[in-house]
Curated annotation (Swiss-Prot):
InterPro entries on file: DUF167, YggU-like_sf
Gene3D superfamilies associated with the record: YggU-like
Lineage, highest ranks first: Bacteria, Pseudomonadati, Chlorobiota, Chlorobiia, Chlorobiales
UniProt xrefs under Pfam families: DUF167
Cellular component aspect of the GO annotation: cytoplasm
Stated family: Belongs to the UPF0235 family.
Record's protein name: UPF0235 protein Cpar_0370
Organism, scientific name: Chlorobaculum parvum (strain DSM 263 / NCIMB 8327)
Length: 105
């Protein structure tokens, strides 16, 4: 999965955010990124907060473990997931992205 990388001991995820969507959720792949749809508008950091909350809930980690590393004001972002390796992140995202070969690994 080209959208997952490593920064120190933590995993990083490259995402493409679509704010003001009709519903919040992970929409699948978008090139070499994961597309995330958010109801929030990109005002007062609301979309970034919602994005981190969604990813934390999806991965089953505390919200404080997920942060925006790059792209605070851009649709393309890099999110850091503390305490999770890239392989753990791959396994956790596989069912959501429909990649069964990774889910069973």
């Amino acid at each position: 999965m080209p959208f997952i990388s490593q920064k120190g001991d933590d995993a990083c995820l490259s995402v493409r955010v679509q704010p003001r969507s009709s519903k919040t959720g992970i929409a699948g792949r978008y090139g070499d990124q994961v597309k995330i749809c958010l109801k929030s508008a990109p005002v007062d950091n609301a979309a970034n907060k919602e994005c981190c909350q969604l990813l934390a809930k999806t991965l089953g980690v505390p919200r404080s473990n997920v942060s925006v590393m790059n792209g605070q004001t851009s649709r393309s972002k890099v999110l850091k997931v503390e305490g999770m390796t890239p392989s753990e992140l791959r396994k956790a995202l596989a069912p959501v992205l429909g990649d069964e070969s990774e889910a069973g690994a």
